[in-house]
Amino acid sequence: MSVAPASPHVLIPDAVLALPAGAAQPPWPELPTLRALVGHLRPSATLALDDDSPATPFEVALARAHGLPDEPGRTPWAAFEAGVAGTPCAWLQPCHWQMGMNDVSVLHPGELGLDEHASRALLASVEPLLRDDGLTLRYLRPDAWLVQGELLRGLSCCSLRRALARPVTREQLAQAPTDAQGRALRRLQSELQMLLYTHPVNDARERERRWPVNALWIGGAGELP
């Protein structure tokens, strides 16, 4: 399903802070073990991505290390991580987002603290809506469900890791290759948000002064041969 690299690779995500142009790097801790390790390594390549890239440099490097398609936004992470071949897949990730006039900010999933019971309750309510559009849904863990179906074919998705780094524009969210597909996905996302808005799980969370799950993030879409 993937081709292993010829030699071992060590990838250290988020090792460099994303700072405004001209800003000075803050002081770093000593990290003697990491410094010793780096002394035995050599950089294999430099990745430079545009600010509006739907993936982070780490994700592109990781895709290459696994022998996966490395075009930002087009790496089939869901299919790869779930071990599914021959059908379009994606992750649906329960999240809390805030929609601004021009951009979208996402709360880190860890701050939601969604447990298995609540996640499965949300999935059970969401599943019939997806089934109506020919999509199948499978629970894998509280913060990630696997969705499969033709409606996902050819999607380009902004990764959640990228969105957590800084706000993204609405145009950077999941993009469909055809207008009909795009309309279907927007309708489905709207229906899902309305369902979540009145869901008992969210009613309970709001009583407990916890962030509600108000959206499902689509990411890692693609197909493995």
Model-derived regions, located:
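N-terminal basic/disordered segments at the start of proteins
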Residues: 1-26
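Loop-centered beta-sheet repeat module
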Residues: 2, 152-224
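Beta-sheet entry/capping signal
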Residues: 7-9, 136, 144
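A short acidic (Asp/Glu
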Residues: 21-23, 148-151, 216
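An N-terminal, globular interaction/scaffold subdomain
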Residues: 22-120, 125
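Glycine-rich, often proline-containing surface loops adjacent to acidic residues and nearby aromatics
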Residues: 98-110, 144-146, 165-173
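Extended, Lys/Arg-enriched charged tracts that mediate electrostatic binding to polyanionic substrates
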Residues: 111-139, 194, 199-215
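Glycine-rich, mobile lid/loop segments that gate access to catalytic sites or pores
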Residues: 141-156
